[in-house]
Amino acid sequence: MNVLSLKILSLGLLLMTLASCVSSPPENLANICEIFEDRRSWYKAAKKAERRWGIPTAVNMAFIYQESAFRAKAKPARNRFLWIFPGRRPSSAFGYAQALDGTWREYEKNSGNSRASRSSFSDAIDFVAWYNSNSTRMSNIERDNAMHLYFAYHEGNGGYQKGSYRDKRW
């Protein structure tokens, strides 16, 4: 075996190893108990976020389900140019929480989690709980009011306070 073949084989093994590290979504997205049975680390991260920010785990998990269907690398669909060609994405939303670039930077700065990754479940659920905790203070929403917390999450607290969610078909 020559050196080039060994390099190609090594690269292939490395890529296969890295691919196995990528988390696929849970099989039954509608059953939080099954999700947590399959992903014990997710349960621990969700409970840690609940303790830290005071937002119920069920609320935070519902947001991640709605935003990304538990896909680590989720992005908004691209707009189409001339009905065929893929264009730009409508926003910078990315990851489990579909957090925008600017909001994620604010989270990193204000939460003390400066090395957070939007494709990390534990970072994403902490982000969702952090954002919801801020919404309870800024927009006077109860911690267990998932519907109004989601309106504030989707529209931003400023949009929520202006009532922009009322004009949308949910």
Where in this protein do the model-derived segments appear?
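C-terminal motif of bacterial Sec signal peptides marking the signal peptidase cleavage site
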Residues: 17-20
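Bacterial N-terminal signal peptides that target proteins for export
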Residues: 1-9
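Catalytic glycan-binding domains that act on GlcNAc-containing polysaccharides
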Residues: 24-170
